């Protein structure tokens, strides 16, 4: 007689084994209709799975994030069902859930077109609207293999042969005549899967290996209701307008080319923004008392072996050789910073020692994963490492948290999600060390009034970690900042200091990044601002335009004055109508468009308008320069107003 404990603490006793669906029905018909799955003793289970002993149960519905993920996974199976009806010869590979949706990789000789995708979507909806039940069967490994062998599903057989133990009992999910294999859970009925859209087609190698066959990957998105789907599609339309690759080209910020995949060619205006970001972070480093250092771009393989990176990271490292020595181009800065720390004897009085670098790093990311500035092979980290004692960890982490929030607020990011990853099963050190480390991070977060979620077991083997994920204007999540404790690397590379009792001790190392990759963060900013950078970041802050040739000399005089004031200014003396010039520079997203006619020239003034079309009237040069300087010094996100 299992006793089921619900989230509110209430208990229900049953005379026999029950499923989540049975419990939901016992509570009420509305909940039974909404039930998608259950979380039984912390583990997600299908709604039909029997609970035979006392258990804690949470009933999952489409209102829960987990419920939406489950219906997305079931939509992948629905896609498989439709594909096999339309092209029975298709061989199905894998169909996982991804952010906001799902995909399925298929082996089909026919090359799918957009018309095919539209037809597939229509067939999926027809199938889902029949509201058929999804039937789960748990079978032996051999029965699962025989089932897929009879259907010619070579990829499912490969998964069974290579990834699943012969002692296992795989779950098969039957969608009428279509059968798929999955860990689950899945929706009990396809009425939950009626708000979806197929988004695109791409190529994908089986198992991500370019030596394997290229498959066709169909991407889709799925949501709990029509409104959520519509909202998501609207956001995607807005995201497409804000795509940093498109805006980067329009504004002539940067380019990339095949001869240097994943490497950025910065143009003048893009590099101007990059340098402004760097200057801003450099001021923060000075404010928080960091040393700025610069390490070599590549180091001998021996050092990477000692640090442990060679064993765990060598596939992602670019290497070269010279004079019978093998070198690796650095994928990260930390081993180099330990080498700088090791120069000269350090005392406990020297700690904490905060070391920062704008480190140029390279990682051999798969070519298929490269995406504009967001995923590159060559990038600059605003990386820092703090060497400190155990007793200093909490205070140092607290300062890092303040620095992260100060920085993000400057760019207008206020919705920050914080997660704390704690000790994994395989780890160095004893429980007492981990207790101190985790408590120090928790207390630092509490001291800053930061709400956080704990991710049990997700920390690195060498220490716990805090992750900062910012949400942009389209509510997309970008994980940028990290604060990571490291109790391993200083020891591996021989870092020590002389303690107060004259003993040699190993410092704790705190890895700290705020923007992460400057390239990626700049890509995020391009999309956040849609290219309309605040004045302090804008590559060109002011453009001055004449109405006739008569004002040309005065325009040049005005621009010279602004440049002497440290304002990024240019002129447009082309023999074009002033309306044409204004439109062109508005499209370039220049914050301030200054027009000069005879009257302005005579009175030593400029007529000021913003890129938003707001007419600010006439101003004396000194007055306008003062207002702009104030905007820049405050790093205001807004332009001047009437």
Curated annotation (Swiss-Prot):
GO terms for molecular function: ATP binding; metal ion binding; threonine-tRNA ligase activity; tRNA binding. It comes from the Bacteria. The keyword Protein biosynthesis applies. One of its GO terms (biological process) is threonyl-tRNA aminoacylation. Its cofactor is Zn(2+). Binds 1 zinc ion per subunit. GO terms for cellular component: cytosol. It is found in: Cytoplasm. It catalyses: tRNA(Thr) + L-threonine + ATP = L-threonyl-tRNA(Thr) + AMP + diphosphate + H(+). CDD domains: TGS_ThrRS, ThrRS_anticodon, ThrRS_core. Keywords: Aminoacyl-tRNA synthetase, ATP-binding, Cytoplasm, Ligase, Metal-binding, Nucleotide-binding, Protein biosynthesis, RNA-binding, tRNA-binding, Zinc. Its EC number is 6.1.1.3. Residues 243-534 are annotated as: Catalytic. Catalyzes the attachment of threonine to tRNA(Thr) in a two-step reaction: L-threonine is first activated by ATP to form Thr-AMP and then transferred to the acceptor end of tRNA(Thr). Also edits incorrectly charged L-seryl-tRNA(Thr). PANTHER family: THREONINE--TRNA LIGASE, CHLOROPLASTIC_MITOCHONDRIAL 2, THREONINE-TRNA LIGASE. Homodimer. This is Threonine--tRNA ligase. It comes from Shewanella baltica (strain OS155 / ATCC BAA-1091). The gene is thrS.
